[in-house]
Regions:
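Rossmann-like S-adenosyl-L-methionine
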Residues: 1-158
Length: 158
């Protein structure tokens, strides 16, 4: 779907079977601009961003239940990626990850997440430069009669 509208699309997937399925779909659909990488996002994201430096980038991130790795969050905040779509299956880790991406939570010297003092006195809805603002958030009940919910969040860098 995205590969038909973009110059290049990269997929980074940890599960070998899912990566093979993506390669198969790429071949079946003749998507020469799609590149699938099997491995950890934290090991490959920086290389992809370096390769695409200067290009208009968009990111769709669907982390595991444990949430986004801290190294990936740091890379995203340091990146020039202006828009991101985050998909989450865990409300608790989504809240944590959004706190970091919006700058409302920061890591202290002990590696613990704490409230960012730079937000003291900042008006509600205002985002500090270099962080992401939440544009839209939508939960989806894809598993009726269970406690599980998928949430899609659209973010834009300030």
């Amino acid at each position: 779907m995205l590969a038909k509208k973009a110059k290049r699309v990269y997929g980074i997937e940890l599960e070998p079977e899912a990566s093979r399925c993506a390669d198969s779909l790429k071949a079946k659909n003749g998507l020469d601009n799609m590149f699938n990488i099997c491995g950890y996002v934290e090991e490959h994201l920086a290389g992809v961003m370096e390769k695409e430096k200067g290009e208009k980038l968009r990111l769709i991130l669907d982390p595991p239940r444990a949430g986004i790795a801290r190294s990936v969050v740091k890379a995203l905040l340091a990146s020039g990626i202006p828009q991101m779509t985050l998909i989450s299956c865990n409300p608790a880790t989504l809240a944590r990850d959004l706190g970091i991406l919006t700058g409302k939570l920061i890591e202290n010297e002990a590696g613990e997440l704490v409230k960012n003092p730079a937000y003291d006195g900042v008006a509600d809805g205002e985002i500090l430069p270099g962080y992401y603002a939440i544009e839209k958030i939508q939960p989806y009940d894809m598993f009726p009669q269970t406690k599980h919910v998928e949430t899609i969040v659209c973010l834009r860098k300030q």
